[in-house]
Amino acid sequence: MAKSAEVKLAIFGRAGVGKSAIVVRFLTKRFIWEYDPTLESTYRHQATIDDEVVSMEILDTAGQEDTIQREGHMRWGEGFVLVYDITDRGSFEEVLPLKNILDEVKKPKNVTLILVGNKADLDHSRQVSTEEGEKLATELACAFYECSACTGEGNITEVFYELCREVRRRRMVQGKTRRRSSTTHVKQAINKMLTKISS
């Protein structure tokens, strides 16, 4: 059997937006009511995505980490889930600054991410419209999902699967670019040698 592809995913957002609940819903298909928001956890999960076995390492960040810790998590990850709570406008407004930090940390690479509006079951308390989420996702050039870790509404599994697909696509593009670049260097070296020989 072929070795499984390994993907490192990290989930970011303000404390209380439901990051842990989203991860637990994805892994267990259940909702757990109580979490310690100061805990950071890493989970391993294997899944078959598009006929390929993928081993995910998922970092559930605490949401209250200091700058050095957060930047270390950003350097570690290959794909990112940025989460806000649709009932908390402040959490939505923190997404763009978070993306800017990600861009700075991952420079010059483009960041692979997905935007998630959580707590869609609390529509009666909504402070961020679906359209605003879609608009921000367009600005960030990423996919957007609204879901509820509590009820399972929306497709949380698809969030993680789509992020894995994006990471794999990005790797393939970077691999081709690297191969093209090294082929060009070899051709240039051969041309230099041939020029010296003929002169």
UniProtKB/Swiss-Prot annotation:
Q: Does the keyword Hydrolase apply?
A: yes
Question: So what does this thing catalyse?
Answer: GTP + H2O = GDP + phosphate + H(+)
What keywords does the record list, in alphabetical order?
Cytoplasm, GTP-binding, Hydrolase, Nucleotide-binding, Proto-oncogene
Classify the main location: cytoplasm
One of its GO biological process terms is: negative regulation of cell growth
Which SMART domains has this protein been placed in?
Answer: RAB, RAS, RHO
Show which residues constitute the signal peptide.
none
Please give the name of this protein: Ras-related and estrogen-regulated growth inhibitor
Q: Which organism is it from?
A: Mus musculus
